[in-house]
Design a protein with these regions (language model features):
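Hydrophobic transmembrane alpha-helices of multi-pass small-molecule transport proteins
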Residues: 56, 120, 129-151, 264, ...
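Helix-helix packing/entry segments at the starts of transmembrane helices
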Residues: 21, 47, 105-112, 177-202, ...
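Hydrophobic/small/kink-forming positions within alpha-helical transmembrane segments
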Residues: 25, 83-88, 92, 115-119, ...
Length: 321
């Protein structure tokens, strides 16, 4: 692959990452709409996963048959295990946190995960942290902290609990991002995403079954109306299926750290939608925080990514059709 081809792949990777961030930024807004109909976090997660499962199973089956993939069981199990961090544990903690915190705060805290990806990568894999990354992170998270402290002073103790849950969600997602690269290189981004979402769905089904058996979940407390079903469908396709494939494609091109850093634009879009659609408060602190985040993102420039292998290129082209 020549230099121009690498630059094209690099730009495509950042485009996928930004697109995924924008779609993911809609997620807390949609979830808040769903909560207004009385549904709980685990039930919402189950509906979302079950609706998405057929899509991932279909795409995964097509890829396996077309590429005639034959790998040891340990590779499949390892990919499924990593997927649990990104699409089961991180999602569950995030949904639980959103029951207590508002949409703007959720998106701000969740975007601590780029820092965690960079730090964990440096500690575990000895990845180099550039001065540009450090400077960008300082600006971004100065803005994040500014907004966080403002919301914390306005809403009280429940925000603390919600924030902790969402912070744990960010940590779980950072682990997923960090360990997903080798599986994407081995399986391809689309197939790995299918495996991850499938394993997360079955984990959610098991969790729900246990919760029902212990009386911790009462489905009679909410009604699956046409309006709620429409919201769940929107959450499933616009804020789950499409961005999950896009972020995997981004990681396969530019790596976990760069994909994570680019996604920092998410809080800005969430704040705009939260104010416009949910009526959340937007103060001077929020404005200052958003400016700092924008300045931080502006310092992030694409890095030259390693040359891609030809099989992965073919698989990526199939996924873009």
């Amino acid at each position: 692959m020549n230099h121009s081809s690498i630059e094209v792949a690099n730009k495509q990777g950042f485009a996928y990452a930004i697109g995924a961030a924008l779609l993911f930024s809609c997620k807390p807004i949609i979830i808040k709409w769903a909560y207004s109909y009385g549904i709980d976090a685990l039930s919402l997660m189950l509906l979302r996963m079950i609706l998405a499962l057929p899509v991932y199973l279909l795409i995964g089956t097509i890829i396996i048959r077309k590429r005639n993939i034959k790998l040891p069981a340990k590779h499949w199990l390892s990919a499924a295990f990593v997927g649990l961090f990104g699409y089961y544990l991180a999602t569950l903690l995030d949904l639980k946190g959103l029951e207590l915190a508002n949409a703007q705060l959720e998106r701000i805290i969740l975007y601590a995960y780029p820092t965690l990806v960079v730090v964990l990568g440096a500690i575990i894999f000895k990845h180099k942290v550039t001065k540009q990354q450090i400077g960008a992170l300082v600006l971004c998270y100065a803005g994040i902290i500014c907004i966080f402290l403002q919301d914390l002073s306005l809403q009280g103790k429940q925000v603390i609990e919600g924030s902790l849950l969402i912070l744990l969600s960010a940590l779980s997602y950072a682990i997923y991002m960090l360990f997903s690269k080798k599986h994407i290189d081995r399986l391809g981004s689309l197939l790995f995403t299918c495996i991850s979402m499938t394993s997360a769905t079955f984990a959610t089904i098991i969790h729900t079954s246990i919760a029902l058996s212990y009386g911790e979940l009462n489905p009679n407390e909410w009604v699956l109306s046409n309006e709620l079903m429409a919201i769940v469908l929107l959450l499933t396709f616009a804020a789950t299926i499409v961005p999950s494939f896009m972020i995997s494609e981004a990681v396969s091109r530019i790596g976990a750290a760069n994909a994570a850093l680019t996604g920092t634009v998410g809080p800005i879009m969430t704040s705009i939608m939260a104010v416009a659609l949910l009526g959340e408060i937007f103060t001077l602190h929020h404005g200052i925080g958003m400016v700092l985040v924008i300045l931080g993102v502006s310092r992030l420039k694409p890095k030259t990514i390693p040359e891609q292998k030809q099989p992965e290129k073919k698989q990526t082209a199939e996924g873009s059709q």
